[in-house]
A protein has these predicted regions:
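Active-site proximal beta-strand in glycosyltransferases
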Residues: 83-105, 112
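Short hydrophobic beta-strand element within catalytic cores of glycosyltransferases
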Residues: 274-277
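Aromatic "clamp/platform" in nucleotide-sugar-dependent glycosyltransferases that forms part
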Residues: 257
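Conserved donor-binding/catalytic core segment of Leloir-type glycosyltransferases
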Residues: 4, 134, 170-191, 197-201, ...
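Nucleotide-activated donor-binding/catalytic signature segment of Leloir-type glycosyltransferases, i.e.
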Residues: 218-236
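A short, well-ordered alpha-helix in the C-terminal region of glycosyltransferases
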Residues: 303, 310, 317-332, 338-344
Length: 354
């Protein structure tokens, strides 16, 4: 079978490893950056608004794929939907909720309303014409099935290579410390960090480091930088600096208002760090509450403080949780397992020659 993978720039690192493992299993793959072969309106690059699909057509003609796999519903997926080649979508987030949030926040002006409506239209066309949708967690699978009652939908988690996550010296932090590694690009996710002031006040001896950036940074930073024990590091180079950061922290905290399958939660556990995460979306599927760390209720600084105190005051128990976390991620989300899941889903629905 010949599989063409169109990946977004933010996920191409992971898709390279995914494609490599599929090659080991006898699947001929070709991985491309999706926007290099298909773009148009809306696009951040004005010159691409009137792009033709000739590069995409040539790619299809030269490679002759049996199946096309994408990790987002953009122009590459849309062009695929116009062919007779089966389109398989790895759905990484709640597309419909994100469209709604965008309309309510960043896309209120008339030009941006037009753009978000076009993204919505493209997405619906891609979903409608796809052969298989693979949401990234069971929580998202349930949401997707409610929208597409007749469409094949199966969960496919994010694969991760444990060999990439090893302790590496570099970044030096003050201790004890809590590491937060998340972006501020979606307000409903980012605004959960506004519960931190109450925790920072109660834990003046604990240093909190936020590695991340995004359009909502300035809505968050002014409230947190008032505290001497809060430090903002900005966005970190991936994966090297992220690995150094996770090597150095004592506890990892995911403080998010909505999330499906945060990769950083997998990475922190592979780095043998005890984790604390907001109990939202698909987050509970990526950890064992009470075993590899703790889930905390949304908008509950009191519980966050209590769970952080448990981990920081019992170093030996926290260490054991971190060790269990690495084993949990290795066993459940390794490349070999997720690639087998992917191929089994294709076989189940007679997609490609498996």
């Amino acid at each position: 079978m010949k599989l063409l993978i169109g990946a977004s720039s933010s996920k191409i690192f992971h898709m390279q490893e995914f494609a490599g493992k599929l090659e080991e299993k006898g699947i001929e793959t070709k991985l491309v950056l999706d926007s290099d072969f298909a773009d148009g309106f809306p696009s951040r690059k004005l010159k691409n608004w009137f792009s033709s699909n000739e590069k995409f057509k040539k790619l299809i003609k030269d490679f002759k794929p049996d199946v096309i796999f994408v990790d987002r519903v953009r122009h590459f997926a849309l062009e695929t939907s116009k062919t007779n080649i089966p389109l398989v979508i790895h759905l990484r987030g709640d597309h419909w909720a994100e469209i709604t949030m965008a309309r309510e926040t960043l896309y209120k002006s008339m030009p941006k309303k037009f753009a978000i409506n076009k993204w919505d239209e493209i997405g619906e066309n891609c979903f409608k014409d796809s052969r298989l949708i693979l949401p990234i967690c069971n929580h998202l699978t349930k949401i997707t099935k409610e929208r597409y009652l007749q469409k094949p939908v199966e969960t496919m988690y994010q694969a991760i290579n444990p060999e990439n996550w090893f302790h590496e010296k570099g970044i030096e932090l003050n201790h004890p410390c809590v590491g937060i590694l998340q972006s501020a690009t979606i307000w409903d996710k980012a605004k959960e960090m506004l519960i931190l002031p109450e925790v920072l006040e109660k834990m003046p001896h604990v240093h909190f480091y936020w590695a991340g950036d995004g359009v909502y940074r300035e809505k968050i930073l002014p409230l947190l930088e008032k505290y001497e024990n809060f430090h903002w590091l900005g966005a970190l180079e991936y994966p090297g600096k992220v690995r150094e950061f996770l090597s150095e922290i004592d506890v990892y905290a995911l403080i998010s208002g909505i999330d499906m399958s945060p990769l950083t939660l997998q990475e922190a556990q592979l780095m043998e760090k005890p984790v604390i995460a907001t109990n939202v979306g698909g987050v509970p599927e990526l950890m064992n509450d009470g075993e590899t760390g703790f889930l905390v209720a949304k908008d509950n600084p009191k519980e966050l403080f209590e769970k952080l105190s448990i981990l920081l005051n019992n170093i030996e128990n926290a260490k054991k949780m971190g060790e269990k976390g690495r084993e949990f991620i290795k066993n459940n989300f390794n490349l070999d397992k997720i690639c087998n899941d992917f191929l089994n889903h294709l076989k189940k629905y007679n997609i490609g020659d498996i």
